[in-house]
Amino acid sequence: MHVVPGLKVLYFGTPVVLISSLNEDGTANLAPISSAWWLGQSCMLGLGNNAQTTVNLLREGECVLNLPSSTMVDAVDRIALTTGKPAMPDYKKKQGYRHEPDKFSTAQLTEQASDLVRAPRVAECPVQMECRVVSAHPFGGPEPHATAFEVEVLRAHVEEDLVIPGTHYVDPLGWDPLIMKFCEFFGGGRNVHPSRLAEGWNMPHQLQSTTV
């Protein structure tokens, strides 16, 4: 039997993306998001208008989409409630966000030079996609609170072990992306780590960690 619970959150499960971009002073920003999907060589990204990443993409017109594996959940969670913006709205403060100018160090991840864009890649991520912004659209009703970005993938870097030998394809059995479902982290179909984001958003469930 179906019910109509009036769902407040519609995050049914998408891969976590670490977006690296450049701040106005040339330093790197790093932000985890899960509002992303791909079609052909393009990707659609959903970002809140109060995010430093949104400001950076509108100004610079480029970024890198870094896809972490499920084993990188610790690094992702370290920056889950951080922002590159010194000033933040009250609702973010109440959720526990803090300003962090050096996200790479906080996440304990390494900057790696890109080939075609100025923003760095995340060396530890098995998949890295250098992108340019094609368009940006207001998103979220009559008073948009977010921006939908269309980006073109200029170059994709993939760990050699993940590529099916002799082909241009990723091995789906070898690739275990970090998935976010309803603000919780999953990999291989299991909850893999407690989520700071779920705590900040007061999600009404507590899942048991089965970290590998």
Predicted segment positions?
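Basic, polyanion-binding surface patches
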Residues: M1-V212
